[in-house]
Regions:
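Glycine-rich anion/phosphate-binding loops
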Residues: 22-26, 125-126
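Conserved AdoMet/S-adenosylmethionine-binding subsite of the radical SAM
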Residues: 54-169
């Protein structure tokens, strides 16, 4: 509903990711340029058009990023904005525990609302499953939510009701 990139038109298997090496090379060049220009980043953030934790080499990409950050701009933080759908994977969990800001999204306590708002691709997606996986971080995460009212595909969507907010807070 609210992603500036729109709905994901691709389906599993149709995704394309930059290679680990390309990410490292481009990040290194960018960080070197920023440091040379005396404008080092405050934060290196993984987010955007797709889910970063779905990258097949996500753990290694995070390792490379932390190494480059430590070498070139040690004051910068590393952040990941995630829809939390991959946090059940051990490699993703390990990587997210290494970043400074592990930001995981959960927009409702109700599966039906999440399906309308976020259109998760997995038929097995459940809020309960996501919450259980979040508990494994032992508080080492930031919970991100967007409360909104609107319409999607002719269907009302509202996670600002008393019922929604009360359930989310539990």
């Amino acid at each position: 509903i609210y992603c500036e990139c729109g709905w994901n038109a691709e389906h599993p298997g149709g995704r394309r990711f930059n290679s680990r090496e390309d990410v490292r090379t481009q990040l290194e060049a960018t960080l070197r340029r920023m440091v040379a220009d005396s404008t080092p980043p405050d934060v290196i953030t993984f987010a955007g058009n797709g889910e970063p934790t779905m990258h097949p080499d996500f753990e290694a990409v995070i390792g490379d990023t932390i190494a480059l950050r430590d070498a070139l701009c040690p004051a910068a933080k590393v952040s990941v904005l995630s829809n939390a759908t991959q946090i059940h994977r051990d490699s993703v969990r390990r990587a997210l525990l290494r970043v400074d800001n592990n930001i995981l999204k959960l927009d409702s306590a109700f599966d039906a609302t999440v399906r309308r708002m976020n259109n998760p691709q997995s038929a097995s997606y459940t809020v309960r499953g996501i919450v259980e996986a979040m508990k494994r971080f032992d508080g080492r995460m930031i919970l991100q939510t967007m409360f909104l009212r609107g319409e999607c595909g002719g269907q009302p969507v509202d996670n600002t009701t008393e019922e929604e907010v009360s359930a989310w807070l539990r």
